[in-house]
Amino acid sequence: PWLDASNLQMTDEEYFDIIERKLPKVIAEKEKINKIYRNLLPESIQMGDDFQNWRFMIVIENRQKVLDAIFKAGLFAGTNFPSVSYMFKGVSSPVAEVEAKHIVNLFNDFRFSEAQARKICDVINSVI
């Protein structure tokens, strides 16, 4: 399971060794997919490179329309980018609240192929 909460059946050292071995491949895969997004999507909707590690973030006005088209094409993307306001009780963050409603995160890991990345760019470009 993706969020397996059971205890590890290895030492911390063994676990971190696995991460260290796999990390270069993970980084290379993310960079390959991110390059497709950078080249095929308008620069005006891309967040800066500092934001593209976990997923590839874009900011769009018509988020729901874009998401509907993405899912209709058999692809997937995320919106799990809440406003930071929820972390600070009683504090209003109007800019963050508005921006959170326009962010879509595109997958850039081993679950998403280069062909899927190109296809999702075509879908997004046809809608925006």
Question: Model regions: which residues?
Answer:
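PLP-dependent aminotransferase class I/II
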Residues: 1-128
